[in-house]
Amino acid sequence: MDVMEALVTRRSIRRYWNKTLPAGVLEELLEVARYYPSGLNLQPLKFMSVAETEDVTFVTENLRWAGYLPGYEIGVDERPVSYILIFGDRQISNQFDFAAGSAVNQLLLAVHGKGLGACCLAIHKKTQILEHFRLNAQRFEPLYAIAIGYAKHGATTVDLTSNCKYTLDENGDFIVPKRTVSELTIIK
């Protein structure tokens, strides 16, 4: 798949098959992650791969899934098999927005390129994540969790007509409205 195809076909995946990733995939993704663009080349992010069942369960239960779908819960048999957690390192910088956005996109595309599914979820329960992994709260700020696994559902895009909320079709696949190019373009 070429880069343009990857950019257009990558969708967020929120349900996964319980199938182990091939050996070395998380390490390869971490290697790719380190090339994220960073202002002043500060590289203020740290990454943690999470693959132990207990840790994956903990992270899954401390994230908010599919916020537009009231009552949506990810089934025990549909959880991702791994995560890459992204942290800001305050010993390097207190500004993470640009770097985190770049790193997230880099990882999502790399996962897609491996034929896997992924979803980026903001970490809101920062204290719980820090305590569970015994990390220094003064130094590290939990930012995002990239859920990774084999996709158990599909996702298609449609032109946005009324609102941007995604929905599920009769097969449980996500329908994701996207703004048209003309709606996104500023003409002077």
Which residues does each PLM region occupy?
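Acidic, surface-exposed loops and disordered segments
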Residues: 1-188
